[in-house]
Structure formats: structure tokens, C-alpha cells
Amino acid sequence: MAVPFRRTSKTRKRLRRTHFKLNVPGMNECPNCGEMKLSHRVCKSCGHYNGKEVTSK
């Protein structure tokens, strides 16, 4: 069975883990009410999407 030849150093381990991070969601300002909303989704506060009212609040 294969075993590691050398112990992985703290630096190598941390450099490898720099890519294991969460991304910030893309937030935009709603053109209708000005609240922050996720891109390509209906605004939670006013119910508008793409300039049209999709849901009634």
C-alpha cells in the first residue's frame, strides 16, 4: 500500500486550501424599489422581475 514519502508541511496544506472558499452571491439593486436582490431572481420586497410585476405582495 502506498504511503506519503514526506509529511505535508503547513504551508503546502494551507496553499492547497486557499481555493476551498465560498463565493459572495451576486447582488444587484432592484430598479423598482431599490432593495438589494440576487441576480436573475424576483425581488423579495416588491415582487418585480425584468420590469414586470411577477408576484403581488
UniProtKB/Swiss-Prot annotation:
The keyword Ribosomal protein applies. The keyword Ligase does not apply. Keywords: Ribonucleoprotein, Ribosomal protein. SUPFAM superfamilies: Zn-binding ribosomal proteins (SSF57829). InterPro entries: Ribosomal_bL32 (IPR002677), Ribosomal_bL32_bact (IPR044957), Ribosomal_zn-bd (IPR011332). GO terms for molecular function: structural constituent of ribosome. GO terms for biological process: translation. One of its GO terms (cellular component) is large ribosomal subunit. Belongs to the bacterial ribosomal protein bL32 family. This is Large ribosomal subunit protein bL32. It comes from Exiguobacterium sp. (strain ATCC BAA-1283 / AT1b). The lineage of its organism: Bacteria, Bacillati, Bacillota, Bacilli, Bacillales. The gene is rpmF.
